[in-house]
Amino acid sequence: MKKYETVIFDLDGTLLYTLEDLTKATNYALRRMNMPERTLDDVRRFVGNGVARLIELAVPEGTAPEVFEQTLAIFREYYDIHCNDNTKAYDGVIDLLRELKADGYALAIVSNKPDSAVKELAEIYFEGIVKVAIGESAG
């Protein structure tokens, strides 16, 4: 008898390599706001606590709240369209998930990435494998 019935995964850096698309979206927003761009390594250090925190760390210190909000909105708009330009599943992940599903586990993704991107990426990479995919949403 299985001890657990459901396995819940994070998305970024766990199932999918998303760093390049996050970096490109960050730099697109920064460029649009005439701010200095960030390196891949910068963005790697900034991710993990949601996109608002990513942009908060990416904008120059002392950025006015309304400018931060505008930068975040630009990021979200760009990333919503470009969240899968360079993203890819880590080697072996899809096979592992299929095996877990075949063993009777319900699989889910919970992420602080925007909900629309989580659902889109889950559908692209894990359709028919992952039962539920939930991301950050307003409210």
Regions found by a protein language model. Give the residues of each.
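Phosphate- and divalent-cation-binding pockets in alpha/beta enzyme and binding domains
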Residues: 25, 54, 92, 117-120
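Active-site neighborhood of HAD-like aspartate-dependent phosphohydrolases
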Residues: 1-45, 56
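Short active-site oxyanion
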Residues: 104-108
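Helix-loop "lid/cap" segments that line or gate small-molecule binding pockets
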Residues: 29-30, 50-64, 121
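Substrate-recognition "cap/lid" segment bordering the active-site pocket of phosphatases
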Residues: 85-88, 114-139
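Short alpha-helical
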Residues: 21, 50, 88, 95, ...
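Metal-dependent phosphoesterase signature
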Residues: 56-95, 103
